[in-house]
Amino acid sequence: CNLITNKETKIITITVTEKGYHYNLENKCLDLNADIINDLEKNKIKTLVGYLSYGLIERFKENKEDIYIISCDNLSRNGDILKKVVTDFVSRINKNIALWIEESVKFPCTMVDCIVPNTKKLPYEVKEKFKDNSLVLCEPYRDWYIENKSELLKSYLVHNKIKFVNNIEFYENIKLKILNASHSALAYLGLLLGYKYVHEVISDELCYNFINKYLDREVIPTIQKQDNFDLVQYKNNVLRRFRNHFLQHKLEQIGMDGSIKIPIRIIDTFKNKNQNTEYVYTSIIVACWVLFLKKTNIKKYNYDVSDPMSDELLNIVNNQKNNVEKIINLKNIFDLSEEHK
């Protein structure tokens, strides 16, 4: 908490993946699960929400200096979600401090576009017996948009190639619905076909054509165009970036937490669908996810199903009849009308 409390700290950036927010999509509030309850009871802190909340509580007591908390995760309105879970948490401890956070701490929404695989031991670390815990491996491409009207934040970040915009929604949409949705689709499709890495599955002509048609026919038509931004060119660049074999981006990593990612990346597009489109590709992607849960793949490649809902999902797909229907009826994932089902 010392860094959060220090009045010299002006900006904190957050990158923890979607599940690190403990946000209940259905109720639009903090998910009071076992880890959050643990943190509220002041046991050994387990969550980002706990660390950040207690740090801001101490900052309130020490100096009440302004601070920017910047989420860099793949969530629509990520800053609003982070602010909501933190204020929900703190309000259970001290409502006055929660009000200060609500009014004074800034949580801008952002879109960060740079593929960053999970970094474990790299070959040279093994060979040279060298370890760097701060190492981040990523692709050369990067884009960072921040929704912001404050000149103060711009002054803090003046030497960075950050694009400040009045409304982040368009940039969120293209990242989530084109890049992230394609990543998830390729993960489930690729694992079923026995591939391990993104560059392998995108190099399969059938898989490339599938994703390309999915984006052209079912995704891009739902995105409202802005200025002179070329959505087709962005799509082509994304698919080209996926071919970078140096990243060694594991499909198993991308396939994690599907119950959180699918509503945001895949289903949200379907809910805003064009009435003249049948959405065959979207249906196939969801079917691939269900088969992924059943560990059905043609090369018998073994992978782990890591998901906060894994117990419930695996029980449905492995032990219950009409399992696809039961999964589609899970409101916290699909939340579909009868017409959309």
Regions flagged by a language model, labelled:
Residues 1-341:
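Substrate/ligand-engaging "lid" and interaction regions
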